[in-house]
Curated annotation (Swiss-Prot):
It is found in: Cytoplasm. GO terms for molecular function: magnesium ion binding; nucleic acid binding; RNA-DNA hybrid ribonuclease activity. Mg(2+) 2 binds at residues 13, 137. Its EC number is 3.1.26.4. It comes from Methylococcus capsulatus (strain ATCC 33009 / NCIMB 11132 / Bath). Signal peptide: none annotated. The lineage of its organism: Bacteria, Pseudomonadati, Pseudomonadota, Gammaproteobacteria, Methylococcales. This is Ribonuclease H.
Amino acid sequence: MSETEPTVYAYTDGACRGNPGPGGWGVLLRYGSKTREIYGGERETTNNRMELMAAIRALETLSRPCKVKIVTDSQYVKKGITEWVAQWEKRGWKTAGRSPVKNIDLWQRLIQAEQRHQVSWGWIKGHSGHPENEAADRLANRGIDELLQSDKIPA
């Protein structure tokens, strides 16, 4: 990675109907004038797991090491990766209250995915009219909709 290399922007979002329930994740990737949309869903999950999965898939989708700015509306993801995870690791994946960290599998996967890239993190208020965040939200909901549609039995 060179210092002059343009940054890939990844706008991420997760959604869940029921929490737990069917959930989806969505990512809008932007690199210069190019954009790419990715999304998916899971039958039984939580909103926080889908928020994490969006960030993970954003990083795992990139074919080579990049400078990446991940923009999320999830304080859980942003604070988790930038503030909490180092302490969790030191405590053997326990919270300050000594209970096991939730979603440890996805936190560890996110840490691994992040290592390939030069990542910075940003937060934006969800559902506040930010076009890229709204696009990521639509993608996350498309992930749920397509999952539920695939579950229907043909007439």
